[in-house]
Amino acid sequence: MDHDPHSLGRQGELLAAEYLAGKGYRIIVRNYRHRRNEIDIIAFDGRTLCFIEVKTRGSLEKGHPVESVTPQKQKEIIKAARSYLLTLENREPDCRFDVIAILADAMDNDRIRSFTIEHFIDAFWEETG
């Protein structure tokens, strides 16, 4: 059964934010936008500023959720992160890029009833040089 991808994505982002808060992260911004680029969640893990991409799928039919964070998507997230850093007083905090993958194990009328969550810490980074 096909599910509304926007609803699934919104639910996944909420579940990810709850997961992070439960792990002691301090959520700063959700759905930060810079031009056409977006970062789903910006949060502090201790003193480390985390830019977090959330991917949610209703099945593995189209692959694991983390597989959709392509090199192009990573570049877009990095561009948005650079923009966000310009808004900070301390423009060079310790940063990292994480991915949270959520697989809906059970759905009921487009609502996630049970799920599996995987947190890929430091999943990618900006290449320098």
Curated annotation (Swiss-Prot):
Family stated for the protein in its record: Belongs to the UPF0102 family.
MF terms (GO), sorted A to Z: nucleic acid binding
Protein's name in the database: UPF0102 protein Clim_0016
Naturally occurring in which organism (per UniProt): Chlorobium limicola (strain DSM 245 / NBRC 103803 / 6330)
InterPro entries for the chain: Restrct_endonuc-II-like (IPR011335), tRNA_endonuc-like_dom_sf (IPR011856), UPF0102_YraN-like (IPR003509)
Pfam families named in the record: UPF0102
Signal sequence segment: none
Highest taxon above the source species: Bacteria
